[in-house]
Amino acid sequence: MNFEQTHRDALTEVLRWRRDVRHFRPDPIDEAVIDRLRAVMDMAPSVGNARPWRVIRVDSPALRAEVLANFNAARAAAGSAYAGEQAEAYATLKLQGIDQAPLQLAVFTHRDPAAGHGLGRASMPVTLQQSTAMAIHTLWLAARAENLGLGMVSVLDPKAVERLLNAPPDWDFVAWLCIGVPEFTDDTPLLHRAGWQENLPTEWERR
């Protein structure tokens, strides 16, 4: 299949308006939409076609509350690395949507999946984590195309999350994903607008 300019324009718009969302409306997400997101995530590339990502959908308010407590502790610990005005700025940043998002997913990487038969990862096992990252990004774009927002929470103690969710011992926690209708949309990252870190172009070096 060959694509045309309308396809390129649509993809660029989805990419431009994809944000790491922290502010969500409580509107529930239709199960048919969630099924579409799951199907698109499975279209992501992976090393050896191993599809090492594993996903737990967390609906329990009690589990979410424990993850939020985990976040609050990890955030406080991370905040000790900052001082002065930077510490004050850090305290104002909203770094999670656990308290609002209607759909929440814990994503893991299987450390040694049988699928793929080890192809492509013997010399670079990190490709399993890279595959999971690509699956998350694929889901992110699919969510945005559904007029949803996705926020990835990384300020967490991963081992505590693994214990809390009773994850198998060969699953490594990667990210907590919050998904829902965003309170607002923006074509500029929140951290750029907040003055924490502006968007900068990446130069491609040549050899």
UniProtKB/Swiss-Prot annotation:
Binding site for FMN: R18, R19, D20, V21, R22, S46, L95, S154
GO molecular function, one term: nucleotide binding
This enzyme's EC code(s): 1.13.11.79
Reactions it catalyzes: FMNH2 + O2 = dialurate + 5,6-dimethylbenzimidazole + D-erythrose 4-phosphate + H(+)
Chain's role: Involved in the biosynthesis of cobalamin (vitamin B12). Catalyzes the oxidative fragmentation and contraction of the isoalloxazine heterocycle and the cleavage of the ribityl tail of FMNH(2) to form 5,6-dimethylbenzimidazole (DMB) and D-erythrose 4-phosphate (E4P). NAD(P)H is only required initially to reduce FMN and oxygen drives the oxidative fragmentation.
NCBIfam families: BluB
Family statement drawn from the similarity comment of this UniProt entry: Belongs to the BluB family.
Protein name, UniProt field: 5,6-dimethylbenzimidazole synthase
